[in-house]
Amino acid sequence: MTGSGGPTLTDGHGQEVAAAPCALPADGADWAEGADATDAAVARSADRQSRRWFAAASAGFVEIVGSCPRDRLTDPALGEWTLRDLIGHASRAYLTLEDYLEAGRPACAAGPSDGRQDSPRTPEPTAGRRPPRLGSPTAYLLAARSGLADPTAVRDRGRVAGEALGDNPGQAVARLAARAVALVARTSGDAEVLTPVGRMVLSDYLPTRAFELTVHGLDIARAVGRRPPAALRVALRPALHLCADLLSGDDRMTVLVALTGRAALPHRFSLV
């Protein structure tokens, strides 16, 4: 509707709301400045969202691990992993965050920052060639799936990390989480992260850690027969969004058909 005061919008109660005036940029430079401002706003929003997701996933993960009975740590949990192994594997989300941020600092030598034997190894840059730039969480997960997915190595790293958690994995995980959350809080979203498959910024890497904590938090809850904590349930929506971004080609159709009840997913279908 329009009136004497210019264009108006109608709100949900049928009341007219005056539209804000829109000034068109005068030239191409103004358009470019506007685009830069928009890009910066989008980046800030993405950074805030990734931090919120990581905080929720971490809180839920710590809670579910802390509730696990110690006498069940040797029970089967996921594939070849015991419950301890699974907790150890998932806790590496914190270790990789620390180590890859450390490796991304200027003039920083690659490798674990504190000598931990269970720390991931970050690669020495190839002479004369910088590691590739990864522009999104999806790009990292796809690259990691191709280059870091040796099942035996993944299994063994999980077991080593699980043993390193000691007699009280709940307390050990809580300490790792507190350290990582504090690190994230004092680090800019555009800080460089150097992973084995490429370089990226923290705001793009953080969702991959939140995804690990979310999915494996659910695995742990299932293994011990407990309802996932509320914080983990909050983390489900961004995890599903990231799963959707990982789909490509016919997989998009396959998943949509399954989600709308037309057919079941193929046997052992997985995005990761």
Residue locations for each model-derived region?
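Hydrophobic-composition signal
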Residues: 35-36
